Every structure is written in C-alpha cells, then in structure tokens.
Amino acid sequence: MKRRISFLSRLLDTFFPRACAVCGERLSMSEEILCGACNLRLPRTGYVHSPYDNELVRLFWGLIPIEKGASLFFYKPHSDTSRLIYKLKYGHHPEIGEALGRLIADEFNVEQYFDGITAIVPVPLTKQRLRERGYNQSMEIARGISAVTGIPILEKALQRVTFHGSQTQKDHWQRNENVEKAFRLTDSSSIAGQHILLIDDIITSGATLVSAAQELLKGENVKL
C-alpha cells in the first residue's frame, strides 16, 4: 500500500535520517523500518498462502479449535529476524512493531487473509512488564494491522496475570508450564460472537497462544 510522503517527513529525513532496523543503512523516503535489501532477505514463511494447514497451525491441532493461522517471517536466534525483534522488544522502538503490523497487513491482504475477522486481541503483558518496557510489542503490531485493515483492537479483553521469563530459551515442557494459567478473560461481553485475530510477536512452541486462546474461547461463540 503506497503512502503519501509529506514535506515535513522529507524535511525531517534530511536532518534526522532514518536507518534500517536490521543493517543500519539509510532508508529511502519510500522505505519504512526495513531497507529493500533486508526486506527481500528476511525469510518469509509463506503460510498465508495455505492458512488452514501449515506448520504453525499444526502446533494447535488437538489443543484448541483454530480457523486459520499465519506468520510473516521465520524466526531463528542470531538472525536478521531475531535482531529486528530484539530491537522491537528491548531497544525501545515501538514504531518497529507498528511498521511490521502494516507490512503484515499489506502482504496478507493480497490473500484476503483478514476476511471475516472482526476483532484483534494482542497477547498482553503483565502490568509490571508493561511498566518496565513502556509498551506492549504485540499491541504495536496489532495497531499496524488495525490501521491498514480497519479491524478494531480489543485491548482490555484479556489480562496477563503471571510472567516467569522469556520463552525463547526454554524447552517444550518448560514453555507449557511457564504460561499455564497465565491469562484471564476480563471482558467476555466484548468478545461474544467475534472472530478474533490473536497476535503475538514470536511463536515458538505455541504455548503462549494456546494459554491465551483457552481464555478467549470461554467467550460465547468465539472463533480464532
């Protein structure tokens, strides 16, 4: 989706040039967060082309009922993707999340991925974690998707009540234990009858999403 470049944006870019979040090279006025080379190099999953049966969706089979699922990039430690996510989560760059959300929306819209989805729920952080970081990276991604698609965000529907550290260094069983009963449904009326897009920044075993989804599915006639 093309976006207008204002005179103010051009002026700011002259004095405060923007850099690619991965390689650090200067961005052109038409580029956002990623330079063209890094955008092409980041490994896309292609799951959006088969959203009903892919490696991601299979993580949830037998655990929760899920209509479809997709992710934009593969994630590996010490990769370009991991550097991008690290800056988003720990580098105080919430704008990366919103830009990634817009990128996801633009690319997924080509496949009509969002057809029928009526609400977006980002995986929440605990209040303490939110205070420490200053923002929820999943919420920022959700904002970007919402800005392009017009799908509303239900920020208060789900609350995170426990957090026992990052999932990335844990094994499968530790991940499941780490997020067991980690969430609480706080506004069941707002999600009744909704087809929800559940957003997280990184998916490893899928344990976090399963825990969050189990709470959301307590709502009446909810689909994910």
What does each model-identified segment do?
Residues 1-224:
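Glycine-rich phosphate/pyrophosphate-handling loop used in enzymes and phosphotransfer proteins
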